[in-house]
């Protein structure tokens, strides 16, 4: 029965994901118009869909807890140390409690970061909120607000991670990593010699799979803090690096522009996506940016601890050094 349900779920997911490319053919056309466009693409309709992933993970988590205490614990209890038996209930509750707190706490603490003139520009108004966009912020169509010091919209929490809930997010992430890694390592060591009951094997596969995912994601977050950037800013830096590789990013008197070659010659545009004006730089001594060393990340303090403090401490001063001498 469980295998049939899994096969059905995988089939439906495949039909939905393939629908955009094969929408000219039935049944993909039905999945595209009825499911993909109305449920997935439209951010305002069927908002219950955003709770599907948290509900799925909550169900898996609850199933693992039931499997452990209902089927597995009796098999491995003798192999557990006494302190483990005392700590396990708290260790099981902590990730769930931290996750609920992170999901319920909005990222709404204002930030006063400086505009670097490359990724973020002053004078830009959010087209949805109709307010001035702070530097390092991002508008989330799912949450319906601009998020200060925005990192990403976490589908597992159905909440944006940003200034105001970084601490709870990191706490939930750390608690999950600790519990899942412990379980993935400890279950095989505590398994009865010479046999693996079906429940124990199922629990080990689930715990180990989620442990790998959780540890990988934690490592990416640690790397972002080290580099003084967010997931949102990392995506912007990828676009900047692509412009450098193509030789289209130029600078003049501390400002950055894109050089675009077309049928009418070369035109220059601001790196501000909201500024659609063309700039006359043909006779100006502009320089082509060819190395990331020419455009340092002004939001990176150079200290992992200070970068982390900017996220965790609502009173921390956001790094305000500006690019000079460009």
UniProtKB/Swiss-Prot annotation:
Where are the bilayer-spanning segments? 2-22, 50-70, 86-106, 165-185, 199-219
Its GO CC terms are: actin cortical patch; actin filament bundle; endoplasmic reticulum; endoplasmic reticulum membrane; Golgi apparatus
Q: Which residues lie on this side of the membrane: Cytoplasmic?
A: 23-49, 107-164, 220-326
Residues of the DHHC domain: 124-174
State which Enzyme Commission number(s) the record gives: 2.3.1.225
The alphabetized list of GO BP terms reads: cortical actin cytoskeleton organization; establishment of cell polarity; protein targeting to membrane; regulation of exocytosis; vacuole fusion, non-autophagic
Q: Which domain of life is it from?
A: Eukaryota
List locations, semicolon-separated. Endoplasmic reticulum membrane
Residue spans, topological domain Lumenal: 1, 71-85, 186-198
UniProt-recorded Gene Ontology molecular function terms: protein-cysteine S-palmitoyltransferase activity
Which keywords, in A-to-Z order, does the entry hold? Acyltransferase, Endoplasmic reticulum, Lipoprotein, Membrane, Palmitate, Transferase, Transmembrane, Transmembrane helix
Give membrane topology per the record. Answer: Multi-pass membrane protein
Which reaction is the catalytic activity of this chain? L-cysteinyl-[protein] + hexadecanoyl-CoA = S-hexadecanoyl-L-cysteinyl-[protein] + CoA
Cited PANTHER family: PALMITOYLTRANSFERASE SWF1, ZINC FINGER DHHC DOMAIN CONTAINING PROTEIN
Question: Which family does the record assign?
Answer: Belongs to the DHHC palmitoyltransferase family. SWF1 subfamily.
Q: Provide the domain comment.
A: The DHHC domain is required for palmitoyltransferase activity.
User: According to its UniProt entry, what is the function of this protein?
Assistant: Palmitoyltransferase that targets several endosomal SNAREs. Palmitoylates the SNAREs at cysteine residues close to the cytoplasmic end of their transmembrane domain. May have a role in the cellular quality control of transmembrane domain-containing proteins.
Protein name from the UniProt record: Palmitoyltransferase SWF1
Q: Which organism is it from?
A: Eremothecium gossypii (strain ATCC 10895 / CBS 109.51 / FGSC 9923 / NRRL Y-1056) (Yeast)
What gene name is given for the protein in this entry? SWF1
């Amino acid at each position: 029965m469980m295998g049939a349900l899994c096969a059905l779920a995988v089939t439906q997911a495949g039909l939905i994901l393939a629908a955009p490319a094969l929408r000219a053919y039935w049944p993909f056309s039905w999945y595209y118009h009825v499911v993909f466009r109305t449920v997935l693409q439209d951010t305002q309709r069927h908002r219950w869909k955003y709770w599907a992933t948290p509900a799925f993970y909550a169900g898996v988590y609850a199933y693992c807890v039931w499997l452990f205490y209902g089927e597995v614990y009796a098999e491995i209890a003798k192999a557990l140390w006494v302190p483990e038996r005392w700590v396990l209930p708290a260790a099981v509750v902590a990730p769930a409690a931290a996750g609920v707190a992170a999901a319920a706490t909005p990222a709404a603490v204002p930030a006063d970061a400086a505009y670097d003139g490359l990724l973020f520009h002053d004078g830009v108004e959010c087209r949805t909120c109709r307010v001035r966009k702070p530097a390092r912020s991002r508008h989330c169509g799912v949450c319906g607000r601009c998020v200060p010091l925005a990192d990403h919209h976490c589908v597992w929490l159905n909440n944006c991670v940003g200034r105001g809930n970084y601490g709870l997010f990191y706490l939930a992430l750390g608690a999950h990593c600790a519990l899942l890694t412990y379980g993935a390592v400890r279950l095989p060591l505590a398994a009865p010699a010479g046999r693996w009951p079906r429940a124990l094997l199922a629990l080990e596969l689930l715990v180990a799979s989620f442990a790998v995912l959780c540890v990988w994601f934690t490592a990416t977050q640690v790397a972002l803090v080290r580099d003084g950037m967010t997931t949102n800013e990392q995506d912007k830096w990828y676009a900047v690096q692509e412009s450098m590789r193509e030789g289209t990013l130029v600078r003049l008197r501390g400002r950055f522009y894109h050089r675009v070659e077309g049928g009418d010659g070369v035109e220059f545009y601001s790196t501000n996506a909201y500024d659609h004006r063309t700039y006359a730089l043909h006779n100006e001594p502009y320089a082509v940016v060819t190395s990331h060393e020419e455009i340092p990340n002004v939001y990176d303090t150079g200290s992992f601890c200070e970068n982390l403090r900017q996220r965790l401490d609502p009173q921390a001063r956001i790094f305000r050094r500006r690019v000079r001498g460009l």
